[in-house]
């Protein structure tokens, strides 16, 4: 591999925000939050990334239904950017002198 062109690929702990389940894997993502994780070589500190849905809570893997708050995301978008009215440029061109 060429040195200096690849992102830093390191161990990271992901935590499911719903269930609290954690798992250690490798990723290029970084976080200022950390967690102590017990390994066969002793306790080590790893970056902690909290995610909304993992295989531990996703309906496809659990077989149960779970309502995801997409409506809240849409409302947040409308509050932030407002409901902008789309103009029809053909109508504007027809009424211009």
Curated annotation (Swiss-Prot):
Keyword NADP: no
InterPro entries: Ribosomal_bL28/bL31-like_sf, Ribosomal_bL31, Ribosomal_bL31_B, Ribosomal_bL31_sf
GO MF entry, a single one: structural constituent of ribosome
Pfam families linked to this entry: Ribosomal_L31 (PF01197)
GO process annotations (BP): translation
GO CC terms: ribonucleoprotein complex; ribosome
Keywords: Ribonucleoprotein, Ribosomal protein
Keyword Ribonucleoprotein: yes
Alphabetized NCBIfam families for the sequence: L31, PRK01678.1
Complexes and interactors: Part of the 50S ribosomal subunit.
Family to which this protein belongs: Belongs to the bacterial ribosomal protein bL31 family. Type B subfamily.
Name used for this protein in its record: Large ribosomal subunit protein bL31B
């Amino acid at each position: 591999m060429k040195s200096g062109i690849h992102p830093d690929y390191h161990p990271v702990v992901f935590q499911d925000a719903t269930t609290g389940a954690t798992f250690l894997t490798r990723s290029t993502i970084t976080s200022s939050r950390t967690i102590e994780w017990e390994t066969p070589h002793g306790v080590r500190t790893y970056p902690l990334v909290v995610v909304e849905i993992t295989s531990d809570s996703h309906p496809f893997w659990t077989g149960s239904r779970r309502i995801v708050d997409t409506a809240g995301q849409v409302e947040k978008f409308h509050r932030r950017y407002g409901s902008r009215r789309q103009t029809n440029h053909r109508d504007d061109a027809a009424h211009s002198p």
